[in-house]
Amino acid sequence: MAMTSSGIILTTVEEVLSWGRRNSLWPVSVGLACCAIEMMHTAASRFDTDRLGIIFRGSPRQSDVLIVAGTVVNKVAPMLRLIYEQMPDPKWVISMGGCASAGGPFPTYPTLQGVDRIIPVDVYIPGCPPTPQALLWGILELQKKIKAKKEGKELIEIPIKVPQESKPISK
């Protein structure tokens, strides 16, 4: 964005959409273990995610960010995939904690070894459990990623055939 000397802001539609998307994230949380408690603490008054435009939603159909917090077991994986598919585009995923990111400290047969095996993940937040500051860091990293991504489609040149001069029909 650029501002002229007369106070007029010059920008593109793509930049306005990017600004709106990154400054009004509506996450839906899938709290599966102790990381969910830290996620709730992040939304409380001390950290206040509302000031960043982050409003937690109860339905995936109203959300654009999925925060997976905690251990994902194989039995829950299809439901998590369904929640992801119900979200409208564009959508982003944050994997919160070591259990969601890599399966946790004890790799066992019912535990999914990373949520990225079933849905694409945009930001990984380390920790067991991650602190509220770490979740805020992850959200800010996601905002940087949204700002850097270009949403518009590339223009392609389509060759145009110019009709040749028509010749009069002779009788």
From Swiss-Prot:
Compartment list: Cell inner membrane
What's a GO cellular component annotated to this UniProt protein? respiratory chain complex I
Membrane topology of this protein: Peripheral membrane protein
The answer to keyword Electron transport applying to this record is no
Q: EC?
A: 7.1.1.-
One Pfam family matching this protein: Oxidored_q6
Kindly list the positions annotated as binding [4Fe-4S] cluster: 34-35, 99, 128
Q: Which UniProt keywords apply?
A: 4Fe-4S, Cell inner membrane, Cell membrane, Iron, Iron-sulfur, Membrane, Metal-binding, NAD, Quinone, Translocase, Transport, Ubiquinone
The protein's superkingdom reads: Bacteria
Query: What remark does the entry make about the cofactor?
Result: Binds 1 [4Fe-4S] cluster.
One GO term (biological process) = electron transport coupled proton transport
Catalysed reactions, semicolon-separated: a quinone + NADH + 5 H(+)(in) = a quinol + NAD(+) + 4 H(+)(out)
Q: Per the annotation, which location comes first and is thus the protein's main one?
A: membrane
What molecular function does GO assign, one term?
A: NADH dehydrogenase (ubiquinone) activity
Q: Is Transmembrane helix one of the keywords UniProt gives this record?
A: no
**What's its job?**
NDH-1 shuttles electrons from NADH, via FMN and iron-sulfur (Fe-S) centers, to quinones in the respiratory chain. The immediate electron acceptor for the enzyme in this species is believed to be ubiquinone. Couples the redox reaction to proton translocation (for every two electrons transferred, four hydrogen ions are translocated across the cytoplasmic membrane), and thus conserves the redox energy in a proton gradient.
Subunit structure of this chain's protein: NDH-1 is composed of 14 different subunits. Subunits NuoB, C, D, E, F, and G constitute the peripheral sector of the complex.
Which family does this protein fall into? Belongs to the complex I 20 kDa subunit family.
Report what the protein is called. NADH-quinone oxidoreductase subunit B
Q: What is the lineage of its organism?
A: Bacteria, Pseudomonadati, Aquificota, Aquificia, Aquificales
